[in-house]
Amino acid sequence: MNEFKYLGKKVNKPSKQLDTFPKPKNITHVMFEGEELTCLCPVTGQPDFNTVVIEFEPDKLCLESKSLKLYLWSFREEAVFAEGLADIIVSDLFKALKPFGCKVTLMQNIRGGLQLTAVAEKKR
């Protein structure tokens, strides 16, 4: 089994490290969904609240969920548009997991009466 940096340990700060582990034999699709992804509007500095759906088709690796939580937490103080954030997340996940495909759907909470959904996808 892999050595996990965060799993089973007390952690009180965000991290950009994504821990992985070997994919179980019959797993073909993995999906995470969370409603607590926050970042800052790069124009106003106001917080943006997002729901994120992460899907990937693993080749050899799966993603350890605690490291993902800490990774998503790391954006709390970053100023970035939703479209840019979706692109950053899919790129980082693709680099760490080397999956057949990865898709990130980011749904920003309604602001000014508009619902924004940004989808970023990478495939081999």
Give the location of each predicted region.
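N-terminal intrinsically disordered, cationic/polar leader segments
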Residues: 1-124
